[in-house]
């Protein structure tokens, strides 16, 4: 069966020679105030291309955040290499929301260098409290679901548990509301307008996520019937990683977020015909999936977009989990021994039939073999029994958008 992983990650052929590079960075970044100042100066000039005449206060925040990210990445790489060299069961937490708030103070405390950073900033004329106020909240969730997801995530960090969290990155996550006696307005909260220094783009990690189309049958040489999902449209899920630090234990786990990309961002033939808007229509339609979380679902299009958002991040996450499993194992009957998936509320519940689809259609398992795997992998947390929180989708919408799952 063909793999759904688009870009194959290959080790360099001259791996022995590459060891020379890693030998050059064997030492850890300094954690004292002088080391922090040197890192900030480096990033001001080389990461942000600023000089003594153009650097502003916000650039100081960016240089500090990037300097801390350097130190997190050192521990992050150590953590991931430990998991690679000592394969153990991995826990994956799937949630549509994460209320992680501001990361600067948390990372300083978890790295154990809060006072060192305060001293470093005072040496260059700044107060840490002022710099902290320049950071915006990450727009990955602001409701009770996001708070509970983050609380669960925080409980895992001190235990050095090999845990991974996945979700979607939204360009304008939630709407900021302003109201008066006469009107109520909603405007996008574009929290990514000045970038997010903690994220690491993974341009090479792309997965196709399919929508619409139809299901057709085919038979193999042994007379077995296989169902194949064909036609429709595909969207690419691109990964962004955010290091999540444990409290002074040098364990840094990963929050992997997915952003929607069009397979073809620009149609040159349509552009040459003079239809400039249609030339980028596919790009706009694809990226709408990761524009705003919880779009208005009063109409059919809003409901369909919500289901798209949920299936999008679930499918990408499961494809990624399977790829990680196959890097060390080949027998899917042992999948549950190496993988545990926790579903946070109803939003990622489409993961159950999606894992069945991937195991049957992509990995070639028989239906009952796949079911034996699926029932041993998932855990589920439900935080409320309010009717509005228990989502339901019409069979007609599900069959139209995801014909293989209906």
Sequence positions of predicted segments:
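A conserved ligand/cofactor-binding region detector
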Residues: 9-406
């Amino acid at each position: 069966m063909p793999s759904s992983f688009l870009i194959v990650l290959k080790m360099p052929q001259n791996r022995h020679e590459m060891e020379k590079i890693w030998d050059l960075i064997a030492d850890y970044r300094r954690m004292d105030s002088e080391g922090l100042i040197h890192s900030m100066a480096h990033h001001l000039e080389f990461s942000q291309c600023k000089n003594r005449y153009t650097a502003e206060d916000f650039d100081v925040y960016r240089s500090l955040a990037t300097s801390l990210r350097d130190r997190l990445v050192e521990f992050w790489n150590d953590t991931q290499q430990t998991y690679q060299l000592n394969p153990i069961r991995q826990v994956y937490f799937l949630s549509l929301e994460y209320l992680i708030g501001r990361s600067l103070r948390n990372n300083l405390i978890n790295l154990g260098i809060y006072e060192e950073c305060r001293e470093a900033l005072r040496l260059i004329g700044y107060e840490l409290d002022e710099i902290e106020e320049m950071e915006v909240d990450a727009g990955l969730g602001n409701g009770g679901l996001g708070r509970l997801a983050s609380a669960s995530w925080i409980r895992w960090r001190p235990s050095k548990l090999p845990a991974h969290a996945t979700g979607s990155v939204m360009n304008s996550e939630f709407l900021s509301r302003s109201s008066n006696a006469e009107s109520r307005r909603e405007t996008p909260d574009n929290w990514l307008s000045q970038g997010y220094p903690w994220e690491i783009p993974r341009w090479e990690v792309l997965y196709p996520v399919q929508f619409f189309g139809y299901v057709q049958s085919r038979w193999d040489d042994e007379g077995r019937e296989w169902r194949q999902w064909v036609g429709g449209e595909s969207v690419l899920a691109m990964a962004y990683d955010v290091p999540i630090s444990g409290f002074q234990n040098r364990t840094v786990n990963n929050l992997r977020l997915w952003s929607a990309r069009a397979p073809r961002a620009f149609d040159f033939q349509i552009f040459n015909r003079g239809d400039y808007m249609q030339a980028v229509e596919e790009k706009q339609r694809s990226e709408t999936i990761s524009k705003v979380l919880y779009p208005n679902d009063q109409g059919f299009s809003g409901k369909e977009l919500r289901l798209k958002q949920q299936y999008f991040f679930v499918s990408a996450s499961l494809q990624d989990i399977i790829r990680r499993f196959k890097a060390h194992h080949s027998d899917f009957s042992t999948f549950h021994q190496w993988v545990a998936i926790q579903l946070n509320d109803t939003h990622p519940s489409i993961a159950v039939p999606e894992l069945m689809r991937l195991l049957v259609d992509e990995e070639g398992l028989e239906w009952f073999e796949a079911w034996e795997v699926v029932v041993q992998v998932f855990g589920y947390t439900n935080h409320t029994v309010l009717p509005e929180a228990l989502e339901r989708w019409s069979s007609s919408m599900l069959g139209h958008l995801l014909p293989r799952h209906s």
